[in-house]
């Protein structure tokens, strides 16, 4: 009975709706030493629940046939089923789930003993990670079970997934809020205790701390409340302090016990803060230039008359002398010329803040028109579709 306290169905209706939308639904239930059977047709019971034998098994077998009267297509997607069953196996360590597709003689077994640790490992496959996976499970005094696994990698995207009673919340909620608060506090305390912020002379934000982070948050809540019937956001107020308290305790201990991992994570955060600050300065630089120059374009750029990017070409030439020759020989209607100093900067090896401080790189950014930074970069604003 305890397992049902933290179970969740499809929008709270589950098998009731499956039954109503099926031309046939057949139940076999093994319980308390007996096997029971019942069958429905288009939602109507064909006979009362009956005992058909004795058993030492425990469990339920449900078979259903979708109604062609309701659905124009009744073909099941094995890819969708596989994705959800894999997710459920990660969320319930040690539970063995078998997916069979008898149409093509396909079978796959999902059985992940590592639970959320293996979930994070699966998501981060092929990426360079900065720390070993941090993973904890705890039962709080409020009766809420909290499980978290996380790892940083060298990418720039945050990938945090939230679940309540095995149900995903794509819009997060109170469990995500508690996690973020504890994560930011723990990292800030570490950075301050190691005097890193003063040494590096930077201010970090929560976004900086979560750059490159992959995390799974799973809570088991006896009576969860959601913002809508689709359960895409958890709003139970008691979950935030439960997650925050558990995460704060476990994560602070992890940073103290794993100094090398903590140092790598701190380095990633500092780089993210510098990049964010450099992007802000670049945006300000571009805006100042736009205010001074009506066209908002670099002074050395000889622009073309064509306004359609698909028909416009930009030629990058080395130095002012080459720029002069190129301007004389170009087709003014569709060809723009931008002179640049030779070998401006190897941006592959340069840190973002150094790259953005280069005048030539700034000129390129302004000329291309795409903007810079996570909030403002838009490749659709590219002013030339052919760059030579």
Curated annotation (Swiss-Prot):
GO CC, alphabetical? cytoplasm
Q: Which reaction does it catalyse?
A: ATP-dependent breakage, passage and rejoining of double-stranded DNA
> Is Cytoplasm set as a keyword in this record?
yes
**E.C. number:** 5.6.2.2
Under Gene Ontology molecular function, one entry of this record is:
ATP binding
The site annotation (Interaction with DNA) covers 343, 346
**GO terms, biological process:** DNA topological change
Function according to Swiss-Prot or TrEMBL? A type II topoisomerase that negatively supercoils closed circular double-stranded (ds) DNA in an ATP-dependent manner to modulate DNA topology and maintain chromosomes in an underwound state. Negative supercoiling favors strand separation, and DNA replication, transcription, recombination and repair, all of which involve strand separation. Also able to catalyze the interconversion of other topological isomers of dsDNA rings, including catenanes and knotted rings. Type II topoisomerases break and join 2 DNA strands simultaneously in an ATP-dependent manner.
Description of how the protein assembles with itself and partners: Heterotetramer, composed of two GyrA and two GyrB chains. In the heterotetramer, GyrA contains the active site tyrosine that forms a transient covalent intermediate with DNA, while GyrB binds cofactors and catalyzes ATP hydrolysis.
Q: Which family does this protein fall into?
A: Belongs to the type II topoisomerase GyrB family.
Question: Which miscellaneous remark does the UniProt record hold?
Answer: Few gyrases are as efficient as E.coli at forming negative supercoils. Not all organisms have 2 type II topoisomerases; in organisms with a single type II topoisomerase this enzyme also has to decatenate newly replicated chromosomes.
Name of the protein described by the UniProt record: DNA gyrase subunit B
Q: Which organism is it from?
A: Acinetobacter genomosp. 6
Q: Which gene encodes it?
A: gyrB
């Amino acid at each position: 009975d305890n397992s049902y306290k933290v179970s969740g169905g499809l929008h709270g209706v589950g098998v009731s709706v499956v039954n109503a939308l099926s031309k046939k639904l057949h139940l076999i239930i093994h319980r308390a030493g007996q096997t029971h059977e019942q069958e429905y047709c288009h939602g109507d019971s064909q006979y009362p629940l009956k005992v058909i034998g004795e058993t030492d098994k425990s469990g339920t077998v449900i078979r259903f046939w979708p109604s062609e009267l309701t659905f124009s297509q009744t073909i099941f997607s094995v890819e969708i089923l596989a994705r959800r069953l894999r997710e459920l196996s990660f969320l319930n360590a040690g539970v063995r789930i078998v997916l069979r597709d008898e149409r093509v003689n396909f079978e796959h077994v999902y059985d992940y003993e590592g639970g959320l640790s293996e979930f994070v490992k699966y998501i981060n496959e092929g990426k360079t990670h900065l720390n070993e996976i941090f993973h904890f499970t705890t039962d709080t005094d409020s009766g809420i079970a909290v499980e978290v696994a996380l790892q940083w990698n060298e990418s720039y995207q945050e990938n945090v997934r939230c679940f309540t009673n095995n149900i995903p919340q794509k819009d997060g909620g109170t469990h995500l809020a508690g996690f973020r608060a504890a994560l930011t506090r723990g990292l800030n305390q570490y950075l301050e205790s190691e005097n890193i912020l003063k040494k590096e002379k930077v201010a970090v934000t929560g976004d900086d701390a979560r750059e490159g982070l992959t995390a799974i948050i799973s809570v088991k809540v006896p009576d969860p409340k959601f913002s809508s019937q689709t359960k895409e956001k958890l709003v139970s107020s008691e979950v935030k302090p439960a997650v925050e308290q558990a995460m704060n305790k476990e994560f602070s201990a992890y940073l103290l016990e794993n100094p090398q991992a903590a140092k790598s994570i701190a380095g990633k955060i500092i780089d993210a803060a510098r990049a964010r600050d450099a992007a802000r300065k670049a945006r300000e630089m571009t805006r100042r230039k736009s205010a001074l120059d009506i066209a908002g374009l670099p002074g050395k750029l000889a622009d073309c008359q064509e306004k359609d990017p698909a028909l416009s070409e930009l030629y990058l030439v080395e130095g002012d002398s080459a720029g002069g020759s190129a301007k004389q020989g170009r087709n003014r209607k569709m060809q723009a010329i931008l002179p640049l100093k030779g070998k401006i900067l190897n941006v592959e090896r340069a840190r973002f803040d150094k790259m953005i401080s280069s005048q030539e790189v700034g000129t390129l950014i302004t000329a291309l028109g795409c903007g810079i930074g996570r909030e403002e970069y838009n490749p659709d604003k590219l002013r030339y579709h052919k760059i030579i």
